[in-house]
Amino acid sequence: MAHSMSRPVAATAAALLALALPQALAQANTSYVDYNIEANPDLYPLCIETIPLSFPDCQNGPLRSHLICDETATPYDRAASLISLFTLDELIANTGNTGLGVSRLGLPAYQVWSEALHGLDRANFSDSGAYNWATSFPQPILTTAALNRTLIHQIASIISTQGRAFNNAGRYGLDVYAPNINTFRHPVWGRGQETPGEDVSLAAVYAYEYITGIQGPDPESNLKLAATAKHYAGYDIENWHNHSRLGNDMNITQQDLSEYYTPQFHVAARDAKVQSVMCAYNAVNGVPACADSYFLQTLLRDTFGFVDHGYVSSDCDAAYNIYNPHGYASSQAAAAAEAILAGTDIDCGTTYQWHLNESIAAGDLSRDDIEQGVIRLYTTLVQAGYFDSNTTKANNPYRDLSWSDVLETDAWNISYQAATQGIVLLKNSNNVLPLTEKAYPPSNTTVALIGPWANATTQLLGNYYGNAPYMISPRAAFEEAGYKVNFAEGTGISSTSTSGFAAALSAAQSADVIIYAGGIDNTLEAEALDRESIAWPGNQLDLIQKLASAAGKKPLIVLQMGGGQVDSSSLKNNTNVSALLWGGYPGQSGGFALRDIITGKKNPAGRLVTTQYPASYAEEFPATDMNLRPEGDNPGQTYKWYTGEAVYEFGHGLFYTTFAESSSNTTTKEVKLNIQDILSQTHEDLASITQLPVLNFTANIRNTGKLESDYTAMVFANTSDAGPAPYPKKWLVGWDRLGEVKVGETRELRVPVEVGSFARVNEDGDWVVFPGTFELALNLERKVRVKVVLEGEEEVVLKWPGKE
């Protein structure tokens, strides 16, 4: 998604018209910024403007007698009838994300570009009172660490409820540019915070739960909001070493494309029925993603089963980037034609609106080519009830949502729950945590809160945030609970100045407990900004080491914040650092969540969804190397292929209590299955044979400790003989969260394992089930294991269409 430069003020449709075509020649980019280096597109006001929105009047307006207002007709027929009324100029004026509408038809201007990554953004928030804020949830990477798919769905559902309430007040669109389901392949990536982490199966489940939560249970008849799966595909670098995302050409094998970079989009299209997909800035194997019919037609529509009339939007200015910097087209008009013909329906930008007339004049496009995309967009709007005249809940359950629904859903406190469930306990020496109120009564306890995150407010939200109702810093949270707080920033995120060290050490000296809150934030990891290093930045480690030396017997707890990981090996190995937690970007209630985890009002059960690599990893090979498998200087990427030793592994996470994990009565320690017998089973109710359940991995989980706690599980598979080498170290095949396991209680964990979990991807991109021996193991400790022997002949279970 493109950087919006600054938050724009609302404009009327007339003002938008003034921003449009007359300025095209004056504003046309003739400076030719080197977008091979510059990662922020120079977006024009017409693109980035937020506008007041209104519904077409199908009762009394000019369209009332047209098919578009006939609620008994199909959404596609209604949309096609509307677009047929447009003149060519009117058609072109509605090909951008900011559609100008058609005033003579009573069709209002419409803004496609709304954001909903972890709450409403690019909404027309009021200055005060109603519609002044919306719930700001934790960033997806922290939410995913909770391993709670119900939570993901619930968050998305709340976002869409609040979005529809804002929409009914003319303050938000019916389409959202979310979720970001790219995988967090390399730790330097600045936008990893927006993603579900480095594992593609996690990303696929996140995509399904988020999209179905946003779109509602019946998207074909009553679409709640249209989700957009982004960024398709192979997008996970911003500006590493001046390699701009706008001009990157990512070389990706068919094997890695099929196995890692696209399965989450396959699930989004086939299973979640996502209504929109965003093509990415980058090129893949020489072709810009928004000009690649292989991605947009062969894969997305023909193979992945994208909904018939779903639309593809470019990332913002990506259509222009086909010309500059990719040089794939000789002019902006040619770039517009390439994108349209490849399958990019809507241009988030102005290239279509300013240059499609030239494309037609050159004979590169016809009106029909352009119409197709606009019809697809308006089909989605019809499904969302944009043209419905009857606003009763019986016919459209979303048109009556209002500010009271925003208040109600925020009061559920799900943002807080998501943060407490996602926070990961990395280290807890001698079980120093939790710092219970019994041992540390707030009225008699002084807490030193030190570090650049100790008084964080806006930092808690990460990026793509709107107006939150409140932002609770760690400092405010501890003060609210009655603790005496000695606050000292000590140092900044990237500071090398030691001028604040003395105050920090003084604050620690007179405290009973020392908490250092630091790490990274959006000054180092953001859109258009990758990290150069994955070490702790600035002199934060120096300050922590001084605090550790001065702590004596006092607990020293370090909060490692931010979306990406930093190398905390020195803290892991320092016996004076009592505990270490990863808190991500925990949202509006982040301070409360961190405090309550530390004090034991909530117990941690999150697990890392990224690998914490040693700092040297970022220097071993180029971040633009997209090959997952180890080769040359590349030691392998993600936990699946990494051949080195992680500081903290993917899936690491500690509890305050102890659990005994054992085979359940239904567990068979060795299973022999015939491939042909499995694949011959009927599966008409499944979209793919890969979804067919093969077995249930079961285990007994007994809480043997002293505290009630949730339990989180990851089930991994590995093999050393099924299919050709090289073999991955392991891969995730399932996961779950058991809530509130009481002391002494035993619960059964049951994780279904599907055919696709036993498939490996060959060099052509085909998913193949090979005969051989697999091992399934529970979590990193591997205390419960099942041996699975597959016999018979290898079979392709998913055929990958190669690019000719």
Swiss-Prot record:
Main location: secreted
Signal peptide: 1-26
Function: Xylan 1,4-beta-xylosidase involved in the hydrolysis of xylan, a major structural heterogeneous polysaccharide found in plant biomass representing the second most abundant polysaccharide in the biosphere, after cellulose.
pH dependence: Optimum pH is 3.2.
Biological or metabolic pathway of the protein: Glycan degradation; xylan degradation
Induction entry: Expression is under the control of the xylanolytic transcriptional activator xlnR and the repressor creA.
EC class (word): hydrolase
Gene that specifies this protein: xlnD
Family matches, as Gene3D superfamilies: Glycoside hydrolase family 3 C-terminal domain, Glycoside hydrolase, family 3, N-terminal domain, Immunoglobulins
Subcellular location: Secreted
Active-site residues (renumbered): 315
Organism: Aspergillus niger
Pfam families, per database record: Fn3-like, Glyco_hydro_3, Glyco_hydro_3_C
UniProt-recorded Gene Ontology molecular function terms: alpha-L-arabinofuranosidase activity; xylan 1,4-beta-xylosidase activity
Keywords linked to the UniProt accession: Carbohydrate metabolism, Glycoprotein, Glycosidase, Hydrolase, Polysaccharide degradation, Secreted, Signal, Xylan degradation
Listed GO CC annotations: extracellular region
Catalytic activity: Hydrolysis of (1->4)-beta-D-xylans, to remove successive D-xylose residues from the non-reducing termini
Protein name (Swiss-Prot/TrEMBL): Exo-1,4-beta-xylosidase xlnD
Glycosylation sites: 29, 124, 148, 242, 251, 357, 390, 413, 444, 455, 573, 576, 665, 696, 718
Family: Belongs to the glycosyl hydrolase 3 family.
SMART domains from the UniProt entry: Fn3_like
Known EC number: 3.2.1.37
UniProt temperature dependence: Optimum temperature is 60 degrees Celsius. Has a high thermal denaturation point. The Tmax of the protein was estimated to be 78.2 degrees Celsius.
GO BP terms, alphabetized: arabinan catabolic process; xylan catabolic process
